[in-house]
Each structure stands twice: as C-alpha cells, then as structure tokens.
C-alpha cells in the first residue's frame, strides 16, 4: 500500500475468488480519490464544471488512466475525462461497452477537507469523531440496520467533519482498478471498453456535453447505485421549479393596505402543497415536492423546488399542481386592497431535468443489460436487487440520447452526509462483478439495433 495512507497497512490480506493485486489496490485508490475535493456548486451551475476543484479530480483520474496504458485519454476544458481500452484477443468484434462515473461529490454538506478512515466494525454504535459543531458523530444500527450484517468488516468512513465521497468516487476507483486488473492480465476476456468520468452529476448536468460519437459505445452502465447488489433501471422523472415573488416594501407602521410581503406569498404557496408529499414522508415509488431553498425579504423572494415521480402521469400532475398553487395565490393577492395594479405577485418557471430511463432500458432490445448484470452479480455470489432509484443518474439522460445505461452498485451507504461509509468487502467485490460483466459481453453478445 502507498505509504501516504498508513491507515490502510493493517488491513491484512483479503482472498476472493478473483482476488489479485489490482483488487486490493481499489481501497488505496478509493481513499486517495476521496481526499481530492471535488464538490459541484449549484450556484454556478451554468458553468461546466461548476467548481474548479473538479478539474483537480479529473487530472488525477486522467493521470491514473495514462499510467495504466489506457488509449485516447482525454481531459477536456469541461473536466470530462474519456478513454478507451482495447478488447481482449478474440473479442474484437463484440460491441463496445461503456462505463460512466461522476467526478463530483454532493454539495449539500461539507466536502473539504475529507479525512477517510478505515475502521473495523465490531458491532453496536461506532463513533467516527466529532462534527464541525463539536457533537459526536457515530454509525448506529438503529438508523442503519444493515450494520448488523457488517460486524467484523472493515468500513471506509468519514471522521465526522465531511461527507466521504463514495458517491461516486467508489465507482471511479472500481473502474480504474478493473483496468489495472486487465493490464496485469490481458487474457481476461473483455470487449473494447469506453470509459467516461464526468462532472456535475450532483446538480443535474446529466453528462450533457459527453460526445457519444467519440465515445463509440453501443450501450453501457453507470455505476452510481447504493449498497452491493443494488441495480437500477428505473429513475424518477425530474423537474426543477423556481418561484419568484415581487412584493412592495413600506414602513411597517404604515403598511396597512399597502405592503405586499414577497416572502409571505411564497409561504402561502408552500401551504397549498400536500404535506405528505415531502421527501421525509415518502418511499419506494412515492413521488414528492422538495423545497430545496427559500430566500428573500419583503420586496423580493425566491423558492426553489424539485419535483419527482416515477410515474409520468403523476409527474405531470405534480407540475400542474404547483402551477395551480401559484395561480391561486396570485388570485388571492389580486383581491387585496394592496393589489399591485393587476401585476401578479408570483411567477413560476418549471424545467424538466430528466425522465425515467425505464422507458428505454425496459425495451426488449435492451433487456440484455438487465440480464447480464444479474448474471455478473450471481457469478460473484451476490443477489441482484432491482430497485426503483429515488433519484437520477447520468444514465437517465444518456439513455434518451441513445446510449442505454442502467445503474450498477457503487456500494456507498448514507450518501450526501457525514455518516457516509463504504464497506471494503463491497468495494472489492464490485471489481469482481465488473470483471464478470465484461466477460459476459466478451462472449459475443450480439444485439440487433
């Protein structure tokens, strides 16, 4: 192990049925990637990348790919890293298979500096450290029941002061470690591979600038799902809504029949949205409205919502409900003595972000993507669990652009928070799964397109 990571030295040897030096290297790579800050920033979402730190992460990955001998390694001005890996002997005519991971980490909590720890979980409550507010941060089976199945295992955790970045740096480490394995043993069966490491997934960019013609893949997989065995070919339909309020500010002592409080108007809209349709009250295939941010004062205010639903009809109904709520509040304010000469207090702008990729992946011609993943997991002793993803991946947009991409496990738990962790066994097993998967596609899986 790299001497820069002394916390990794005492982990000992791990023997899996496909184990190799390249497999054990996945842990070192993951820790190293986590230590490179790369949060995206919704405040500058019109720029790609939205934050310069993502370029640093892109440079690290591009350098690792070149060191392994990947072909056509490119790092462009938008922090997209792409590369190719040639097919093994005899698999040259198989369609090119893509793997796509994202370089950025979530922006909702602290993302720098990141201090990964490798800790043996012995059961019960495991203290990670203290948060930035001084409060103790711990993993607890009361909130993470899966810990009961991880007793005696090594976990990569935070120190309580930031997220970890397993979403999606665990996936980046897995893919690079797969290539290390193929470089070490070129006879491992695999088709030609196209690799894409992209920015700004966490703010809904959706790999929009990825050149699919240059990538040259017939189909592929994103690696951005949760615990080992998770497989997603359903995502939410997603939209974002921005509601702006224009009020009239006057001295509170003379406000009667004159003042129009922009912030109060936004609160009235929020009251009209069913309370049970918020993220904290929904699960599985239940959609929601999420008030992501609200800011402003009496004169001007703004509320940002995201709208999510797996069902297309319900999704459209949710957008209509929000528009109706805005119209109702405008009508209510128009009847007040303080009405602004017929000018509405509120305006709303709704933009679709991505669609449920099941519309593409569930087509008969793409069914092999589901079955091949199931076979690859099974070859490594893992039962695949197809779950509707309560979120989205770059694969959602890529699928509708002509590159069908369901989603494999990245093996992170508690994403986007200071209790995020990744079990080392899951991390290493997924390298085995990826090897099994490329082997399946090296069998000459021909698809009519």
What spans do the regions from the language model cover?
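N-terminal capping segment at the start of a domain
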Residues: 23-51, 156-157, 249, 356, ...
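Short, conserved charged micro-motifs
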Residues: 92-93, 253, 312-317
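Acidic-glycine-rich active-site phosphate/pyrophosphate-binding loop
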Residues: 134-154, 232-244, 374-375, 406
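Glycine/charged-rich beta-loop-alpha catalytic/anionic-binding loops adjacent to active sites
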Residues: 147-162, 246-250, 380, 412-416
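A non-catalytic alpha/beta surface segment that caps or lines the substrate-entry region
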Residues: 45-94, 98-100, 104
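Active-site metal-coordination/substrate-binding segment of hydrolases
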Residues: 91-192, 197
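Acidic/histidine-rich catalytic neighborhood of metal-dependent amide-processing enzymes
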Residues: 147-236, 278-292, 296, 303-310, ...
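Metal-dependent amide/peptide-bond hydrolase catalytic core
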Residues: 8, 263-449
